[in-house]
Amino acid sequence: MTMKRAIGLMSGTSLDGIDVALIESDGESIRIVKSANGFIAPLGPTGYRGYREDEKTLLREATRDAEGIRARADRPGRLPQAEDFVTHAHAEAIEAFLAENGLSPADIDVVGFHGQTVIHRPKLGLTVQIGDGAALARRLGIRVVSDMRADDVAQGGQGAPLVPVFHKALAEAAGFAGPLGILNIGGLANATLIDSSGNMLAFDTGPGNGPINDWMKERTGRDLDEDGATAARGTVDKDLLENLLGHPLILRQPPKSLDRNWFSHRLAGYLTIEDGAATLTAFTAHAVARSLAFASERPTRWIVGGGGAKNRTLMTMLERLLKAEVLNADAIGWSSDFLEAQAFAYLALRALEGLPLTYPTTTGVSEPVTGGLVSEP
């Protein structure tokens, strides 16, 4: 198949902003430049459009209002305003990205638009990512693929995680053999496990940065625990940690996908700022480690992306608990910040070709499923 240029967009549950990334792929192989040591050069240019505080507030309020959704088309409370904002902000992000990189809409074959998840209840057959793909396509003059989780959920899958097929393709392109773990730590954490035969298992492991960020925002006014410095000064409350790890969703057999709102920072409310940060950070790390009970082979190497890869305390905990080599994605030429945006560019190309986005071992769907809603400009 012909290599095409795709832009991927990701606005995660951490609500920090919009990641933009361009890749070249045919929906199967990925164009890379590989160095002698097996590491790779960046896949393509990237960009970012941060959210202002008032914009974050709107999205938080819309997410709370989303608890009232009973059907996918429902938009109670502030959701209509938030959906318009999400579409507009993503358009701004791409327009700025194109200008910064000397590109025009004609240079891009497709945009993969994830939107903003406001509710994810796969057992109820419900997943909603706000953002209007058709309106985005009209404004940009570029074909857009959006709503990539819905088909999987409609066919009995968890609708998440979606990135494993990209993880596997990137690992193969870079020459990394299994047993390998690829961990993305955003608001939630999800793992892709590739065994020595190339078989793939993927699932959400539990909380990511979400509870830590919420804790820091509430206690300090800061958006995150920079470099894990606050957690590093604290002591883990072992009793609370064991209580948190007893959450039924942590213990559930894959396939499983989780909702950010199922893990609250408020359970640590009686602790000091430092001890709360340490305990919530340990919760994320231990949930990943306990997920290895579901693996056919224990990975000997982990590649970590997402905001959590920049949390030194979390990375240290992971290295100790996983008893394996733990690498920041940036250190091997991958992108810890833009891995998910790159994945949605890749998924958009697969959707155009009718290739599967999800598999029984990634979402629990009964057979491989493609997906996505294609909107022409």
Swiss-Prot record:
It is an enzyme of class 2 (transferase). It catalyses: 1,6-anhydro-N-acetyl-beta-muramate + ATP + H2O = N-acetyl-D-muramate 6-phosphate + ADP + H(+). The keyword Kinase applies. Pathway: Amino-sugar metabolism; 1,6-anhydro-N-acetylmuramate degradation; Cell wall biogenesis; peptidoglycan recycling. Its EC number is 2.7.1.170. Keywords: ATP-binding, Carbohydrate metabolism, Kinase, Nucleotide-binding, Transferase. Transmembrane segments: none annotated. GO terms for biological process: 1,6-anhydro-N-acetyl-beta-muramic acid catabolic process; amino sugar metabolic process; peptidoglycan turnover. GO terms for molecular function: ATP binding; kinase activity; phosphotransferase activity, alcohol group as acceptor. ATP binds at G12, T13, S14, L15, D16, G17, I18, D19. Catalyzes the specific phosphorylation of 1,6-anhydro-N-acetylmuramic acid (anhMurNAc) with the simultaneous cleavage of the 1,6-anhydro ring, generating MurNAc-6-P. Is required for the utilization of anhMurNAc either imported from the medium or derived from its own cell wall murein, and thus plays a role in cell wall recycling. Belongs to the anhydro-N-acetylmuramic acid kinase family. This is Anhydro-N-acetylmuramic acid kinase. It comes from Methylorubrum populi (strain ATCC BAA-705 / NCIMB 13946 / BJ001). The gene is anmK.
